[in-house]
Amino acid sequence: MAAITENLSNLKVSGDEEKEKIKMHPYGINVIGVKQVPKSKVSTLPKAEERDVNTLLEKYKDSIEELKIKCKDVLSLNGNDPGIDLIYDDLFLLRYILSKKNNLKKAEEAIRICCKWRADPEVREQMLKPVADNTWTEAPVYKSFCKHMVFGVLGSQVDGGILFYLRDGLGEPNAVFESLSRDDFLKIGFQSREYVYRWCDTETRRLGRFVKAMFIIDMNKVKLSQMPDSRVQKCYAELGEFSENNNPQMVDKYLIVNAPSFIPWFIKIIGPLFPRSMMEKFDIFPSTPNLGESEFGKTWINLEYLPDYLGGTFPTKDLPKELSGELVQRGDGDLNKITVGRRSRKYCEVMTPTKGKVDYKFALVSKGVYLTAMFHKNPKEVNKEQESPDQIVIQEKLKISAENGVYSGVWEVPESGILIVELSNAHSRFTGKTVKWNLDFI
């Protein structure tokens, strides 16, 4: 795979500029409607002077040189894999200078966090490599994410910047932790931002113009009950802090369209959780005219691939499945449901015909319970307290909570018998707990 951080000189094509052949970057290959602008047209784009890289490099050259000295030790941490590693050059430093408004102390702090994070072997292998290989969307955790969230990329801005859509009204975002742990959620968030950042950095280097992302958040038919709960809010806030350090100058706007009347209030409530610089990029677009019919839309978006429900000309029926809502899981999927009353215990079980493995999944609607798993060789010897003489502890007593998302994995059982899981709510004086669960012998 060609590295997406190739230098500008490597992407130039000789010959008539009007017939310039543009090499599509790897992340746009599988996206419908991406249009890359020829270099010869850069001066005609909106905010041409404001986003000109060479002008900004010259303006902040002294700050760049100072940061090079201050950050020399961490800038040397960069690896040698062009598919994974960014180019730690003047443009890289300029991003931080602009984002931190030329506060070099804050810029240095963020650069150090970013470089150390990217140098971590586990991060490189688990987070960055799948994005570099363009395989991250094939992972089971990503597919589980798509059962609850409707999001994806379609078309592009007039300068080739990415258009990232979120359609909250079609999804069930607060059910996401029935399929994912909190760490899984954050992993998809980190990888999504890496994908967007790579896209923007590639085009920025090719054009010599800061190319940024635009997130279009469609709130059509969203109910207040569908708005992110505290668990999702905390994850989004952590991802916002992450982007502050790792993805400077990546986002131009978070554009909210079809906003219900309660959205300004909701944003005011959750705003303190997020970085101020992130909240400053949120815009609530008026209901009329439609985005595609507005001056802003006509100026910034290739309307041919803007969905028709937003005033563009791309048919809704032709939307990719990740944006149509057809991947969303309605109901509880493969999960059973059990209610554990206050001061009580409930049990889940699965028969095991031989030595093998049991795939388990437990998700709470709210709060937490204590979980213990025991294996019993002879089901007939299990008494009413769910104990037997030769029982084997498979999982020691562990508190699982809604806050941490789904608790899932694989337990090994030694032979034929029965695995019994105790869910204890004995500690709760007043409230029962609802647990969604599944056990499968594999």
Residue ranges, per PLM feature:
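Basic, amphipathic alpha-helical/coil surface patches used to engage anionic, phosphate-bearing ligands
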Residues: 2-442
